[in-house]
Amino acid sequence: MKNNYSEANIKILKGLDAVKKRPGMYIGSTDSRGFHHLLWEILDNCVDEVLSGFANTIAVVLHAENQITVSDNGRGIPFETHSDSKISTIDTVFTYLHAGGKFDNDSYKIAGGLHGVGASVVNALSDQLQVTVKRQGKVYRSVYENGGKIKQKAHCIGNAKIDEHGTSVTFRPDPKVFKKIHFDSELIRARLKELAFLFKKLQLTFVDETGSGEKEVFFTEAGISQYLDELNADSKQIAQKIFVSGTEDDIELEAVFQFIDGEDEKLLSFANSIRTSEGGSHEASFRQSVGDVINNYCRKYNFLKERDKNFEASEIREGLNGIIKVNLPEKIIAFEGQTKSKLFSKEVKAVVQKLTQKHFFQFLERNSVDAKLIVEKLFYNRKLRQELKQQRQIKKNLSNPKAERILFGKLAPAQSKKVAERELFVVEGDSAGGTAKMGRDRFLQAILPLRGKVLNVEKINNKKEAINNEELLTLIFCIGTGIGNNFTIRDRKYDKIIIMTDADNDGAHIQILLLTFFYRYMKPLIEKGHIYLALPPLYKFEGRDKKARYLWTEQELEQYRAKHSHFNVQRYKGLGEMNADQLWETTMNPMTRKLIQVKLDNFIQAEKQINVFMGDKTELRKSWIEANINFSSEN
């Protein structure tokens, strides 16, 4: 490092250069979530027009070559020359950071876009972007390239009908910023469907030109009540839905929640239509208010005696499913960072508290049968938690005798003392487990073979059954975080937990059993990106040169067959068919292996998949595995 630190070392990033230099500061990451975030930003700008009452249709079209168009029938971006920038307002919005109508309290009373930087950030991180505006009987267009450089400044390209208005943005993420760009049509559908739930009678359309090309329409009459019905579709409801709505101090709240027969809490929250996946002030106030109402009601009607403790938050949250939607004035809305995953606005707390307590207490007073069923469930939760005291010991380290006894002879630990370096391979069977133990990097990689049958946790009644299953209990001890409400992610003993199974139907079934367990009892491991699937090769290919090549797909095999006239092909039926060196080289070596990181991008879709995977209908599970997982067959 040079010691001559002077004014020459200080760089001033002009225009959109700051975004290009540090894209993660603005969109969170440059992986698939990053380029999808660009789409969400443009979509959020359309939604802002809906929130303000100026638009009722939004259209998304996915084109070839990773181009995508988002249109609305809102007011349209003004095209007149801006007084400060001295260029068209369209070009100002798309080439200046912190330029937009959201800094003017009159233009957008409520908005969810990225505080005036969304459009320009998308432009900065796209290699092509085109804006078309219909407004005041004119059609204007601007074209940009190479990260926001003006190719064609805003200019009139024709006339529009006087009642035609709106904005259309077509862009392509910059391949120099994002690797392996591929828009996920299912993810886009899920977001459009979510918006249809959030805004009654808003029409959203989607056309996937890379697929069927058919127009899909998303529209609801009942809004978030319909959303909760879908969330609870496969659950047994304890009581009817509870509705909360009202406006205080220009803050609008709409919420619907329901208690179901289950142990998980499923609470989805939104602020100005933005999904706040990490919660925030609105979610915290809602939870606190629900708990206060329940305890006050139980005291008033003597369900809780004087000697009884109040219900704890963790007891109340088990089986509580709900949707919370708040709309806040732009002047007070505050998110954590630019990606808006957590709401910080303090003003929302009192409003949510007042309205939730009022409506929920009225519901309990007016619906005594439902109230009694809810209270009975809470007492059941309390009784179950008392029976699960042994589970609290799971969070303790592996020095306790029970853990040592359970793990003895099973776990081959990693030697590194640093959690960030350690990997745990959860391996199907003793045979593959033994090979993995011989082939691994002993310093960084731990091996845990699964010897018995993994429990399908979707078919059990409570956590007690999960921790009585030896294979799951071993896994719980090994990971070290605890489960359910006693889960603490900072106690994890590994940074990567890698499921390594055979590439066949049985292997896929074991993967799904384990993923179901992680989803139900250790969900933050998935949310924080710590769960992976190993991808062992399907084939070993040797040509005339006798050099071994490992192939992962049927397509790769066909390509090699076309290039070689003489060859031998071995189809790996299981991990145990590879020796230790081969398993290391193909599946475990961080420099050469292929891993799939398990992600949770859509809550309801995940719920539905889990129910397909692990519910009572085995024919659904079998057909899904056969349709969606390609194991390739021997020829």
Swiss-Prot record:
Binds two Mg(2+) per subunit. The magnesium ions form salt bridges with both the protein and the DNA. Can also accept other divalent metal cations, such as Mn(2+) or Ca(2+). The keyword Isomerase applies. It comes from the Bacteria. ATP binds at Y5, N45, D72, G113, L114, H115, G116, V117, G118, A119, K340. Its cofactor is Mg(2+); Mn(2+); Ca(2+). It catalyses: ATP-dependent breakage, passage and rejoining of double-stranded DNA. GO terms for biological process: DNA topological change. CDD domains: HATPase_GyrB-like, TopoII_Trans_DNA_gyrase. The record marks K453, N456, H509, R621 as: Interaction with DNA. Gene3D superfamilies: 3.30.230.10, 3.40.50.670, Histidine kinase-like ATPase, C-terminal domain. It holds the Pfam family DNA_gyraseB_C. Residues 422-537 form the Toprim domain. SUPFAM superfamilies: ATPase domain of HSP90 chaperone/DNA topoisomerase II/histidine kinase, Ribosomal protein S5 domain 2-like, Type II DNA topoisomerase. One of its GO terms (molecular function) is DNA negative supercoiling activity. Mg(2+) 2 binds at D502, D504. Heterotetramer composed of ParC and ParE. This is DNA topoisomerase 4 subunit B. It comes from Mycoplasma pneumoniae (strain ATCC 29342 / M129 / Subtype 1) (Mycoplasmoides pneumoniae). The gene is parE.
